[in-house]
């Protein structure tokens, strides 16, 4: 595929070059601003919306009244009466089943948007300029690998087509049939509730046919899936950039292609079919930044590059890195060695002291055993226990003590001793 500049070849209905050339209109060199295209597309698309709203009575067609406080239930209004499940249920609130929605929609919403005329023209210029770049067109998914040239211009004889078979044959000759096959392959069922609203099927977009006069071309192309037809005097950004994305594959008739300079003008001459309008200017005449920066004018103004290399030294922690510590303090090695030796010496002293104490304790216990005349018995842990000495039981405490305690014997009543008066016999 060729992207010819500044002349464009005109192709015949047989798909071959007719030998005629057309000068590339200046609008194809306009700045491409995807942000403006997206903004204009978003706002213009809102103008197709139809007002909708819920009923003003929805959710309020019941006799409900709050029960007030003191019943340990929420204070939401409740349906009156009895004998049915509905009685006592909450009503009116947006949190209730059968209640109204929050902030019910109204028909007096601001549905439509006004867009500046200059902005709309800028967006159309950007969309047309993007349609001439094969990379952008292919990024949109159009199958233009075999198309001979972009922009693709055909003779005006095509505007007189009235049969669909003629249009299909033309697309085959121009190698644009692959884009139509892509549309057929993409036909599928819509997701969501649009299926119930006469929008069951969706499909991809195909080529956009732009003509100057309708001599039957609309009837010839309108039944081919994915095809969009536009009059060059009534270009629509919603069709040139579907979804707000630039890069639609466009097929032009020769007269429509020649008319673009009159519609949008050149930078040297204003548009003749529009009142005081000219193409938007580029912010940069030359967008090749590398070429600009390497130009002798800029290089002359720049200073020579500094080639001195400053190596960044990694600072290491001397408390964790012995090599760095020895660089800072060579005596640190001697200090560390002395510390290790002192720790080893202290450890040996502790071990010897513990061994001497154990030996003294052993000798003392042997002495006591010899005095008692009993042979000492060595226990499991190396301690000597006296033979014949019973181990005292620990006193029981709590419930165990109460369970094992023997009941005290019942005390007999003490017999009274006779007093001196009782001992004396009666006279």
Swiss-Prot record:
Q: Where is this cross-link: Glycyl lysine isopeptide (Lys-Gly) (interchain with G-Cter in SUMO2)?
A: 239, 327
Question: Residue positions of the PTM Omega-N-methylarginine?
Answer: 97
Q: Where is this region: Disordered?
A: 369-427
InterPro entries (alphabetical): Ribos_uL4_C_dom, Ribosomal_uL4, Ribosomal_uL4_dom_sf, Ribosomal_uL4_euk/arc_CS, Ribosomal_uL4_euk/arch
Post-translational changes noted in the entry? Citrullinated by PADI4.
User: Which positions bear Phosphothreonine?
Assistant: 266
Give the compositionally biased regions (Basic residues): 377-397
Covalent link Glycyl lysine isopeptide (Lys-Gly) (interchain with G-Cter in SUMO1), residues:
364
> So what family is this one in?
Belongs to the universal ribosomal protein uL4 family.
Task: Name the chain's protein.
Answer: Large ribosomal subunit protein uL4
> Organism, per UniProt?
Pongo abelii (Sumatran orangutan)
């Amino acid at each position: 595929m060729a992207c010819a500049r500044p002349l464009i070849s005109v192709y015949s209905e047989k798909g071959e070059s007719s030998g005629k050339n057309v000068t590339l209109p200046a609008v194809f060199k306009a700045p491409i601003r995807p942000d403006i295209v997206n903004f204009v597309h978003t706002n213009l698309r809102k103008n197709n919306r139809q007002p909708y709203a819920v009923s003003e009575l929805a959710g309020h067609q019941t006799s409900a009244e709050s029960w007030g406080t003191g019943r340990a239930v929420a204070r939401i209004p409740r349906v009156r009466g009895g004998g049915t499940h509905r009685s006592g249920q909450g009503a009116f609130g947006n949190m209730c089943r059968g209640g109204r929605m929050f902030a019910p929609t109204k028909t007096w919403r601001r549905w439509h948007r006004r867009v500046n005329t200059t902005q709309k023209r800028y967006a159309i210029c950007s969309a047309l300029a993007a349609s001439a770049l094969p990379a952008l067109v292919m990024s949109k998914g159009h199958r233009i690998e075999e198309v001979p040239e972009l922009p693709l211009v055909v003779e005006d004889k095509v505007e007189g087509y009235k049969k669909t078979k003629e249009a299909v044959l033309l697309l085959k000759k121009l190698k644009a049939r692959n884009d139509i096959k892509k549309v057929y392959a993409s036909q599928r069922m819509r997701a969501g509730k649009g299926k119930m609203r006469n929008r069951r099927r969706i499909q991809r977009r195909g080529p956009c046919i732009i003509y100057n006069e309708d001599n039957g071309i609309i009837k010839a192309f309108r039944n081919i899936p994915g095809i969009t037809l536009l009059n060059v005097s009534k270009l629509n950004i919603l069709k040139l950039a579907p979804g707000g994305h630039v890069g639609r594959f466009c097929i032009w008739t020769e007269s429509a292609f020649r008319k673009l300079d009159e519609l949008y003008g050149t930078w040297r001459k204003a548009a003749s079919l529009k009142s005081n309008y000219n193409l938007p200017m580029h912010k940069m005449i030359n967008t090749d930044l590398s070429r600009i920066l390497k130009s002798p004018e800029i290089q002359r103004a720049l200073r020579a590059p500094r080639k001195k290399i400053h190596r960044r030294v990694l600072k290491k922690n001397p408390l964790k890195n012995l090599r760095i510590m020895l660089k800072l303090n060579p005596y640190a090695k001697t200090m560390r060695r002395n510390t290790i030796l002192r720790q080893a010496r202290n450890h040996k002293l502790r071990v010897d002291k513990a061994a001497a104490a154990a030996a003294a304790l052993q000798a003392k216990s042997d002495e006591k055993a010899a005095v008692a005349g009993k042979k000492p018995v060595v226990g499991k842990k190396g301690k000597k226990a006296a033979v014949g000495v019973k181990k005292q039981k620990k006193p029981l405490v709590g419930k165990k003590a109460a369970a094992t305690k023997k009941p005290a014997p019942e005390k007999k009543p003490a017999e009274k001793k006779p007093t001196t008066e009782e001992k004396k016999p009666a006279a």
